[in-house]
Amino acid sequence: MKMKKLNIYIIGLLTLMLCGIQSCALESEVFDEITPSIYPQTERDVRDLVTGNAYSPFQNYDYGGLYNVANGVMLISDMATEYGFCSWGGWIWEPLEFARWTPSDEDRIAYPWTNYLKGISKMTLTIDRITNVNMNKDLLNQYIAELRCARGFLAFLLYDLYGPIIVADLETLKNAEDEIILPRLSEEETHNFIVTEPVSYTHLRAH
């Protein structure tokens, strides 16, 4: 009789445990990536995100950055117009000095385009991601204006070297897996983008 009661007790206990396990909703936590749902959340997050995406292209670090000494925008512009030359000798800079570049020289000639055109898209996504963060609205508007000004200035630098640029809209950027090939803007569209983007920043500074 005692064994029977013990068996019933054990079976009942196991049943309760199994019910508890089945009713437990497991939610996974992602630790290896940062998504818009978890970042940015605070004013500090926004500041860091804006600093990283609005200002990082305009720097010089060794052979990186738009203003680097080896193949930045200033060096390419100066050498292509005979205003400057490279004291290191011909080598990869010779095509610029003598306007004799070929497809094989693309890596150096197109460095700002291939490495920093995407910066415009990063700034567009950053504007979208910070817009609804709960923070001081005046400061938020300032950050958005800084991003737009940076977009306009980056577009100007690239247009000066390569002509009309490619600007992806937000919907395309949010559906990057569709792999849509975008055309360049027209001359007029590029001009308008360059002129109107910094306006928000200058207007904010004036007030």
Where are these regions (language model features)?
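Bacterial Sec-dependent N-terminal signal peptides
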Residues: M1-D32
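Short acidic-aromatic linear motifs embedded in glycine-rich loops, typified by GG[WY][YF]DAGD(H)
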Residues: C24-E146, A150-N192
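Acidic, proline/serine/threonine- and glycine-rich low-complexity intrinsically disordered segments
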Residues: P198-V199
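Conserved small/polar residues in nucleotide/adenosyl-binding loops
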Residues: T202-H207
